[in-house]
Amino acid sequence: LGSFVPDLDNFVVAYATLAKLPTEGIHRTATHSVFFVAATVLVFYLIGQWRKDVRWVNLGIGLGLGNLLHSLLDMLVWFNGVNLFWPLGGEINFWANITPPEWFMKFMDPAEFLFFGIYLWVLGSWARKYNTDKDFAAKHRMWMMIEFALFVIFTPLVYIMTKGFLTIFGALYLFSITTAFLVTIRMRKTIEAAEA
């Protein structure tokens, strides 16, 4: 779950876009920061102490690690910087002096759907391997196929649409990240079986 948290800032970007507010400095800042990670771990640690339940502490550590791994992966894979120490500034961009081809940068948007599809495929493989979440298999398969279909549909669209692509893509991206987040929660038995 923690690896989804940093990109939930896209909901704020969407709101700002719809409200005609500036979107600069929203994505890959606060939710990608090590201070956000530390705050997440601390909040869940305090809840765990208050409730006297180590599961809350473990959840906070898991969310924090997932969040941190996401931010580090963004720095390695995307060609945009990450404000790892927000609000102190100092965007880190390993690729600052490299200009990737335009076709590749465009491809990165529909590739998000491909990666959601692969993630859901892995969950399904684990569910079959560990014989878990059988009652959710059909719905899971449907969500996975939707993600692969979105990838197939949006790959040519990113190259041929001159206006409106990011609005449609953004709405479906928010739908996809929400779906992946909820499917992950729904299939927690599968994830727990894979971790054992």
Where are each of the predicted segments found?
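N-terminal membrane-targeting hydrophobic helices
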Residues: 1-196
